[in-house]
Structure formats: C-alpha cells, structure tokens
Amino acid sequence: MYLIETYFRLTALENNIESQSRLLNAVIDQWRYNGQIIGREIPLYLAEEDGAQGFAMRVICPEQDSLFPQNNNAEVNRALQEAEKCGVIFDGFQLVGDDFNSDQTAENASPAWQVLYTTHLQSCSPIHSGENFAPIPLYKQLKNQPHLTQDLIKWQENWQACDQLQMNGAVLEQQSLAEISDHQSTLSKHGRYLAQEIEKETGIPTYYYLYRVGGQSLKSEKSRCCPSCGANWALKDAIFDTFHFKCDTCRLVSNLSWNFL
C-alpha cells in the first residue's frame, strides 16, 4: 500500500471553512467505503500549493492509482461534486512512498476463489485472494455496488471490534467471541450474506471465515465437522498456514483452534 498526499484547491475563499471541511470529510467517507483509501483516522489540514490556498490530507491507498477517476463510484463522484459547489476542487495527489507497515495488495482482482476475512490488527480490504491471501481493493470488484461496499466496511468494523474485545479478555469477552466464531451469530449471518452477495456480483466463489479458539483436545479439533452442514471439512494441508478447514458447499473456512497451534 502507499502513503499519498491529496490536495484540494480553494476557489471560493469566502466560504466557511467548517462547511468545506465537512464536505471533504464526506469525500473521505465515500473514498473509504469504496476501498480507495484505508483507515478511519485521516488528517485534514490547510495547505498551500503554487501560492494557492487549499486543503490537504494524507491517506493510505491500496494502489498508486486508487484515486484515479476511473476507480470512483457514483457516491464518490457525488461527494466530489458537492465539494466543488462549495469551492473545493480535487486538484490531484502525490505519492509520498510505500507504507511498509501495510499489506501488499493483490495484483489479480479475479482469483479462482476468495475469502471474507479480517482481524483487529488489519487495515486493508476484507476481501482476500485465494491465490496468495493478499487483500483485493473493493473498487476492483464492487465499484458499481456502493451500498454493498459500505455494508462490507461496517461489517469489518464490527468484526474487528469484537475481535479486539475478546483478545483484551476483560469486557464482553464471551459475547464477542461468540459473534466471530458461531456460524449462527448475528455477525456471522451478516458476513455470510455479504459473501453471497459478493459471489453473486463477481462470479467468484467467496468464503466466510469462522474464528476458532478453545476445544477439548487436538484430536477432537482435527475431527471437527462443518458447523453448517455437518460434512467433513478438514484439509490435509493448511491454506496460508491459517485455514485448516474448508467447506465448499457452505462456503466456510476456519482455523484449527488457536489453543493447539
């Protein structure tokens, strides 16, 4: 991923800065929902370029060209148009450098299969390639489905919040763990629905990840069946050293309990 500085030129200095920054935050939201920028804490500040005053922000993008117009969806274009009406025009961006703390983006946006996966530590697209486990930018597959991409980001935020709570082990640990590990939980049902919608839109088999921790023994863990259909789903060899179970019928993957890894 890449650290990029964007610049918005001001053409109407008499307009209210508070209103202009609010409109720019709307642009940030739509870029984020479309997968063009990653993360929620985006600094926005006044800047000057070639003697002209404007706004700038520093963002993390999955690709160098993520902010090119051809990657925009209808909601991004609408937010940019609203900002222009208030005298704030997106004037371009410059690449600051590679972000070595970020995941490397998948080059192939149409893998043979993919998985909906995240953790509380990740800052990337929740769609991961079945070829190399690299994240696939949302706009690469779902640019024409802005409501679906926004729903995906909200699901990801909820999953990460539950993961953080269960990892902290202090507040709502069991409830949070159930949400990310039980295939019938509200969060899992939502995620599986999203995976189905992604597959319907892309034609790419899209799996849902079920977190696993606990269990009685390594032997009993290895003999676990798919929680949805009851079929044998154990893999001979783990995929990406993460997925030890995979059900092609139910589109589910899971790990061997972290207690025994």
Swiss-Prot record:
**What Pfam families does the record tag this protein with?**
DUF2310
Q: Looking at the record's lineage, which domain of life comes first?
A: Bacteria
Q: Which InterPro entries match?
A: UCP029037
Please report the name of this protein according to its UniProt entry: Uncharacterized protein HI_1292
Q: Lineage, please? A: Bacteria, Pseudomonadati, Pseudomonadota, Gammaproteobacteria, Pasteurellales
